[in-house]
Amino acid sequence: NWDGMTDIASAIQIQKGLGATNLVAGQLGGTINIVSGAATAERSFSYKQELGSDSFLKTTFTANTGLLDNGVALSGLVAKKTWNGYVDGTWSDAYSYYFSAHKTFGNGKHTLDVNVLGAPQQHGQRDEDQIYTVEDWKSFSSSDYSSSDDFRRASPHRYGSGWGELTEEQYDYLNDNYIGHRGSTDWAHDVLFGGIMHTKQVGDMYLINTRTNYYHKPVWSLNWKWNVDEQSSLSTTFYGSKGRGGGTGPMNTRDTFMGDDGEDDYYKYFNPAEMSDGSGTIDWTQVIANN
């Protein structure tokens, strides 16, 4: 949820140890206070582009009206971040947003602030119990991998696991039939990503992940401050947060079609045409044959 807040915050305060807070209970491990709000920002508009390794790209727009003569101030941030991932198959797509509205009224004695923020994201997960590709397993004898010290240990290098390569035709088929992207999660995932992405184009490759992680838990708040007199004030805050997140994939029953006998029918999940012989750690042709 806090991705992008550094671009809109006017100050970030870090307190170590025991700290006081207006919410629920004191913080024993420390407190991070992000100071933001439309009223404190100067009038401005900014566009920022960030580039990094492995095709990292982040685009950020921010806008602030400043405090207007009528006591109104508005601030907003929208950002998009994509990354192919350091490890194979660990692509990432993410958005972040922040909107704030401020109003001063009652001869300056009352202020009202409304804030909404969130950061929907999805990324391909890595299965840490595999380090070999399909081609590796085909080349091994049973004695090779059963005696290996690296067997069933996480890969120390960039070879990922839990993904397989599709042909462009298969990729298009899955997405055209709304199978590569599963919906009914929440509005942000449906609108921004078209649902949960099980298929993904990364560079020139078309991938399918056994696990896709997704998360979105927006936070909204309403703050009212009343300056009673020079010595006293009253602050009232209403806030809430509701979201959805987790990990899912084509091997979960929630995202597979049921066969005629009541069992999961993975064959219906994929294009019945020939599967790809491309690299990856899952032999999808054999998965289909076994199911």
PLM-predicted stretches and their roles:
Residues 141-205, 261-291:
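Flexible glycine-rich, low-complexity coil/linker segments exposed to the extracellular/periplasmic environment
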Residues 11-13, 32-34, 236:
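Non-catalytic regulatory/gating segments with a bias toward low-complexity or hydrophobic composition
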Residues 1-16:
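Short acidic/polar hinge/loop motifs at secondary-structure boundaries
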Residues 200, 204-249, 291:
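Outer-membrane beta-barrel transmembrane strands
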Residues 16, 36-38:
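Flexible glycine-/small-residue-rich
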Residues 44, 51-82, 87-181, 187, ...:
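Transmembrane beta-barrel wall of Gram-negative outer-membrane proteins
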Residues 14-16, 43-46, 81-84, 199-208, ...:
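Extracytoplasmic loops and strand-loop junctions of Gram-negative outer membrane beta-barrel proteins
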Residues 24, 52-55, 89-93, 203-204, ...:
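Short sequence motifs at beta-strands and strand-loop junctions characteristic
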